Amino acid sequence: MADSRDPASDQMKHWKEQRAAQKADVLTTGAGNPVGDKLNVITAGPRGPLLVQDVVFTDEMAHFDRERIPERVVHAKGAGAFGYFEVTHDITKYSKAKVFEHIGKRTPIAVRFSTVAGESGSADTVRDPRGFAVKFYTEDGNWDLVGNNTPIFFIRDPLLFPSFIHSQKRNPQTHLKHPDMVWDFWSLRPESLHQVSFLFSDRGIPDGHRHMNGYGSHTFKLVNANGEAVYCKFHYKTDQGIKNLSVEDAARLSQEDPDYGLRDLFNAIATGNYPSWTFYIQVMTFSQAETFPFNPFDVTKIWPHKDYPLIPVGKLVLNRNPVNYFAEVEQIAFDPSNMPPGIEASPDKMLQGRLFSYPDTHRHRLGPNYLQIPVNCPYRARVANYQRDGPMCMQDNQGGAPNYYPNSFGAPEHQPSALEHSTRCSAEVQRFNTANDDNVTQVRAFYVNVLNEEQRKRLCENIAGHLKDAQLFIQKKAVKNFREVHNDYGTRIQALLDKYNAEKPKNAIHTFVQSGSHLAAREKANL
């Protein structure tokens, strides 16, 4: 029944009701000139050609032709909302960041949830990591915590990131998703085992965006007012409780309501059911990092909670839907390099790579002045620098202030109090191979200690159900990796694959290589 529709379905109805007492606006061109007729083009006679003087038509079509901006290369499908972060516990002994200044302080935030590999029109219910990015609008500029719904990631070296994403996207010739590409990469990079295991567990398909946790994933550095620093990780735990979708429900929803997560978030906020997350940190001292049993900056691993317990900090609350999706969600740009004083980067290689990649892709997608777009603008800080001009400069371009530094005319000066914390580094410079930095211990703990028997069963079924479409030699490599985690893990997956392969014989012939070549020798070794 139309009378019982949800707020998202009734958006146009509500918009009209809100303007019931107002007269309709006068229709104009983009330049504000009134339009006399929006239904008929100007022609030479009723059946004649169009005239170039029809500026109503050319204004409309020229803008329409340019409506689309480049799609995000990853995290293209997303939902956004706005709200606040409130401090509930004092952590000023760890960080001088103004966002944590005192208990009760509220900071405006913007949040974007997303899937990773799919295009902007893809379903919300696919098995895929979820982006969970938070923009804090602080007095010292924006802080972007660009996280996911998992505390780990597939790789630990940013040089692999383009290849990893290519393997999850579409085949360059067929333009189809390709299990060979996905599993070939994962099987050749066993550091992905932890994230792959999480992805194919029950938490791989969250029930919308409100019922999942968020994580900064990387290791960061906190610096207090005395210049003392610690390493930290950020966690935000859902107050709605964890809920996941079964494979069957996810498949059904992908057909019936592919925008399920977007709709659920919008309707919850529109009806006053504001979602929230409790914000925590883990803290590790520099001396603890030196004696840690593995690299504390490795994003494929977690910090054990029994050794580094969660410390409560505050609450994230979302209480406003976007006024316009394109303006406030499609154009929002999250950048891990946006860190106010008191929050800094660690030597985490993946984080270091993202410090360059994210602002670089924003400049491509939105232009060099993307920080002037209202949703990205650090509106609670005064921006004063020596950057000028460029496409889509939408503000006063800092007027007549000097555009060079140093100068003698009272223009902006740097602040020594904002200097980064000094860090000692190794003098040895080379390309360090980290491919075999214990890829199985924490995965084994996840499989044996975190999952129960039913969850292990579903995990293996989910993996085998996806891996079965890859070629046999790739299946064998993947199963070998799972067996190195735990024999039971690999054995279960192999047993399920054997059933699939008996029902649907595989063709193990793959890319042709010349007999006797180095590629042929390598492929023989893989079989």
From Swiss-Prot:
The modification N-acetylalanine is found at A2. GO terms for molecular function: catalase activity; heme binding; metal ion binding. The modification N6-succinyllysine is found at K13, K221, K306, K480. Its main location: other. The active site is at H75, N148. GO terms for cellular component: mitochondrion; peroxisomal matrix. It comes from the Eukaryota. PROSITE patterns: CATALASE_1, CATALASE_2, CATALASE_3. Gene3D superfamilies: Catalase core domain. Its cofactor is heme; NADP(+). The modification Phosphoserine is found at S9, S417, S422, S515, S517. It is found in: Peroxisome matrix. The keyword Oxidoreductase applies. GO terms for biological process: hydrogen peroxide catabolic process; positive regulation of cell division; response to hydrogen peroxide. Keywords: Acetylation, Heme, Hydrogen peroxide, Iron, Metal-binding, Mitogen, NADP, Oxidoreductase, Peroxidase, Peroxisome, Phosphoprotein. NADP(+) binds at H194, S201, R203, N213, K237, W303, H305, K306. Belongs to the catalase family. PANTHER family: CATALASE. Catalyzes the degradation of hydrogen peroxide (H(2)O(2)) generated by peroxisomal oxidases to water and oxygen, thereby protecting cells from the toxic effects of hydrogen peroxide. Promotes growth of cells including T-cells, B-cells, myeloid leukemia cells, melanoma cells, mastocytoma cells and normal and transformed fibroblast cells. This is Catalase. It comes from Callithrix jacchus (White-tufted-ear marmoset). The gene is CAT.
